[in-house]
Amino acid sequence: MIMTTTPSIEGKKIERYCGIVVGEAVMGANVFRDIFAAIRDVVGGRSGAYEDELTNARQIGFRELEAEARSMGANAVVGIDIDYEVVGKGGSMLMVSISGTAVSCSDL
């Protein structure tokens, strides 16, 4: 499946707009990881635990987006937008929301 942030795909013709698709993932933050991340931030290191959680959440979101697009008969998603939100009590959770337009396209 082709997935792109652009509104069109070079070399392809959009035959049908299937609809808006969304993939979301909400990940809880572990208290111990939060403590170690804060220590790393103080000493200037990168927080690998948070980076791993972001990557995992993004991958889940893209899988959901693709599954929804396929269920509509699409073979591509255009205009993809990725949003990140900190949610939950005290910002204890991370939400990744990915949206786009499912389309059916063919070669030019």
UniProtKB/Swiss-Prot annotation:
The record's listing under InterPro entries reads: UPF0145_dom_sf, UPF0145_YbjQ-like
Q: Which SUPFAM superfamilies match?
A: YbjQ-like
Q: Which domain of life is it from?
A: Bacteria
Protein family (similarity comment): Belongs to the UPF0145 family.
Q: What is this protein called?
A: UPF0145 protein Patl_2194
Source species, please? Answer: Pseudoalteromonas atlantica (strain T6c / ATCC BAA-1087)
